[in-house]
């Protein structure tokens, strides 16, 4: 077996075989409410259809998530005055605070990992990530 296959096997067994609490938290951010909050924070108001496309989810799933976020006071839905079939979703101040908290939590988690790796390994990791993305 070549080093590439061995490295791949080792990486995958660590990623998928040992689900850490942090990994679970980070994967939550890739779907559900955290994703919608971050998407609206980055991109501004969007329609549910745009959010579904960005999330690669059904509009029904997005509608359920939007209802939950609306109940929490984190988003508003407004009908487009020029076309009443279109609904624009925006973050409220509470939603923006949640987005900032999510970003800060992610920063802290990643910085903790980097502190455990040390400066040299962190710089190597970042250089490799930049090179291959």
Positions of predicted regions on the chain:
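Charged, amphipathic alpha-helical coiled-coil/dimerization segments
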Residues: 68-127
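Short, locally clustered residues in the helix-turn-helix/winged-helix DNA-binding domain
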Residues: 38-42, 103, 130
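N-terminal helix-turn-helix DNA-binding core of bacterial DNA-binding proteins
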Residues: 20-61
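A short secondary-structure junction motif
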Residues: 15-22, 43, 72, 98
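N-terminal leader segment of winged-helix/HTH proteins
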Residues: 1-31
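Generic structural concept
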Residues: 5, 9-12, 37, 92, ...
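Residues in the recognition helix of alpha-helical DNA-binding motifs
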Residues: 65
């Amino acid at each position: 077996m070549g080093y590439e296959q061995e490295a791949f096997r080792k990486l995958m067994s660590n990623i998928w075989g040992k689900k850490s609490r942090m990994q679970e938290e980070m994967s939550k951010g890739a779907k559900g409410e955290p994703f919608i909050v971050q998407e609206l924070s980055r991109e501004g108001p969007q329609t549910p259809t745009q959010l579904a496309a960005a999330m690669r989810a059904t509009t029904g799933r997005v509608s359920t998530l939007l209802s939950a976020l609306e109940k929490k006071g984190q988003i508003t839905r407004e009908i487009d005055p020029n076309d009443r079939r279109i609904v624009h979703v925006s973050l409220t101040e509470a939603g923006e605070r949640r987005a900032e908290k999510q970003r800060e939590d992610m920063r802290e988690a990643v910085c903790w990992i980097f502190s455990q790796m040390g400066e040299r390994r962190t710089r190597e990791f970042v250089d490799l990530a930049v090179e291959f993305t």
